Amino acid sequence: MVNPTTSEVQPTMGVKIFSAGVSACLADIITFPLDTAKVRLQIQGEGQASSTIRYKGVLGTITTLAKTEGLPKLYSGLPAGIQRQISFASLRIGLYDSVQEYFSSGRETPASLGNKISAGLMTGGVAVFIGQPTEVVKVRMQAQSHLHGIKPRYTGTYNAYRVIATTESLSTLWKGTTPNLMRNVIINCTELVTYDLMKGALVNNKILADDVPCHLLSALVAGFCTTLLASPVDVVKTRFINSLPGQYPSVPSCAMSMYTKEGPTAFFKGFVASFLRLGSWNVIMFVCFEQLKKELMKSRQTVDCTT
């Protein structure tokens, strides 16, 4: 992600992974209500999720959830979300530069677009497989409603892991890996590569210095591009993960059912919520990530100088 100047020390792989994990967790805590609103909007209109309550827009969904199910509902599934970022974002973001450098080893020129995309594909794919159980639990906790006397499927995050593994199967914790892999390959490549290219263009053309305003603008552009490309796969992933056993035989059948029953616009349900969430998440995560890397390396230099 644009190498630091010669006067700066390159962050180590450990610093990048730690910084990515901490920054992603902070971003998740702040933006989680938007993510919950996105999930509710995405499953709206689905058979098992239908109810007398209709969600209208992002703020309307958040307000309705707070009024009908209580403010804590906006953070239902947060522990799984934090676990997801620790196991997922720390790897896909923290390893991106190192994998990119590996693909570019032996070359004096900067990493090509192909190398950047390859790095995004590899880190995103590995992270999805490791973090998929946390994604399944997070989505199900966000989707379940406590209204109309409906008994919730899960009483908490760890109860959800246990119930899913014992009543469905252990493999169900990896349910939806295919659409989630597709989604996160798109997200990882688009998000990291767009951020990398945008930041590089701003810094190399001396439009902005490699500082907070540059990181903020690059993150916003990356967030919009990512949401636009990933939204259809994201909706299918959410529907499939949240589905009851046997409701959809496969991922394609889930997508086809959405198309025939709700039309093509169903694939962009919750788009505004997705952008608000991903855009703000990107800004918080990337700005914190860049600053934390710098501060950790400064601290390390200070320690090295005193020893």
Curated annotation (Swiss-Prot):
Its main location: mitochondrion. Fatty acid 16:0 binds at K56, K269. Changing C288A: No effect on UCP1 activity in thermogenic respiration. Expressed in brown adipose tissue. It is found in: Mitochondrion inner membrane. SUPFAM superfamilies: Mitochondrial carrier. Pfam families: Mito_carr. Changing C214A: No effect on UCP1 activity in thermogenic respiration. It catalyses: H(+)(in) = H(+)(out). The modification Cysteine sulfenic acid (-SOH) is found at C254. InterPro entries: Mit_carrier, Mito_Metabolite_Transporter, Mitochondrial_sb/sol_carrier, Mt_carrier_dom_sf. One of its GO terms (molecular function) is purine ribonucleotide binding. Solcar repeats lie at residues 11-102, 111-201, 210-295. GO terms for biological process: adaptive thermogenesis; brown fat cell differentiation; cellular response to cold; cellular response to dehydroepiandrosterone; cellular response to fatty acid; cellular response to hormone stimulus; cellular response to reactive oxygen species; diet induced thermogenesis. Sulfenylation at Cys-254 is increased upon cold exposure. It increases the sensitivity of UCP1 thermogenic function to the activation by noradrenaline probably through structural effects. May undergo ubiquitin-mediated proteasomal degradation. Changing C254A: Decreased sensitivity to activation by noradrenaline in thermogenic respiration. Has no constitutive proton transporter activity and has to be activated by long-chain fatty acids/LCFAs. Inhibited by purine nucleotides. Both purine nucleotides and LCFAs bind the cytosolic side of the transporter and directly compete to activate or inhibit it. Activated by noradrenaline and reactive oxygen species. Despite lacking canonical translational encoding for selenocysteine, a small pool of the protein has been observed to selectively incorporate selenocysteine at 'Cys-254'. Residues 1-10, 97-116, 196-212, 290-307 are mitochondrial intermembrane. It is a multi-pass membrane protein. Residues 33-73, 134-178, 233-266 are mitochondrial matrix. The chain crosses the membrane at residues 11-32, 74-96, 117-133, 179-195, 213-232, 267-289. Disruption phenotype: Mice lacking Ucp1 display an absence of adaptive thermogenesis in response to cold. Compared to wild-type mice, they are sensitive to cold and consume less oxygen upon treatment with beta-3-adrenergic-receptor agonists that normally activate thermogenesis. They also display impaired adaptive thermogenesis in response to diet variation. If they display lipid accumulation in adipocytes of brown adipose tissues, no overt obesity is observed when mice are housed under classical conditions, i.e. 18 to 20 degrees Celsius. However, when mice are housed at thermoneutrality, i.e. Induction: Up-regulated in response to cold in brown adipose tissue where it may regulate non-shivering thermogenesis (at protein level). Up-regulated by high-fat diet (at protein level). Most probably functions as a monomer. Binds one purine nucleotide per monomer. However, has also been suggested to function as a homodimer or a homotetramer. Tightly associates with cardiolipin in the mitochondrion inner membrane; may stabilize and regulate its activity. Mitochondrial transporter that functions as a long-chain fatty acid/LCFA and proton symporter, simultaneously transporting one LCFA and one proton through the inner mitochondrial membrane. However, LCFAs remaining associated with the transporter via their hydrophobic tails, it results in an apparent transport of protons activated by LCFAs. Thereby, dissipates the mitochondrial proton gradient and converts the energy of substrate oxydation into heat instead of ATP. This is Mitochondrial brown fat uncoupling protein 1.
